[in-house]
Amino acid sequence: MALSEIDKQLLKRCLDREPRAWEDFVDRFVGLVIHVVNHTGNSRSIQISEQDREDFTAEVFLAILADEFAVLKRFRGASSISTYLTVIARRVVVRELLKRKISAM
């Protein structure tokens, strides 16, 4: 799927560190990230508390911010940005769930 013009401009604004770009990015994709957090927990029969949901969502956005937006810089447009972020979010949530499982042992 081709990258929409809106998403293309939003990515460019984030990478150029334009004012309000990050806030617009979060506003656009926070619903998707929360959905992925919930779905990832449900698919593993794990009840995710509201606090965990907020923590996991924050971890996803921190992962995107890490290393000067390295995750966004690696996006090549082979899929929609939503599909790409879904994969990123799922990986972050699974990693966080595993960390919590290990620390609970």
For each of these PLM feature ranges, what is it?
Residues D16-D27, I34-E59:
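Short, charged helix-capping/linker segments at alpha-helix termini
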Residues F25, F29-V33, F56, V60, ...:
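Residue-level preference for hydrophobic side chains embedded in well-ordered alpha helices
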Residues R17, A66-A70, K99:
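Generic structural signal for alpha-helix termini and adjacent loop/cap motifs
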Residues Q47-E54, F69-V87:
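Short, aromatic/basic-enriched loop-to-helix "N-cap" motif that marks the start
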Residues H39, V87-M105:
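Arg/Lys-rich amphipathic alpha helix in sigma70-family domain 2
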Residues H35, A66-D67, V94-R95:
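Amphipathic C-terminal alpha-helical segment
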Residues S4-Q9:
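Acidic, Ser/Thr- and Pro/Gly-rich low-complexity regulatory segments
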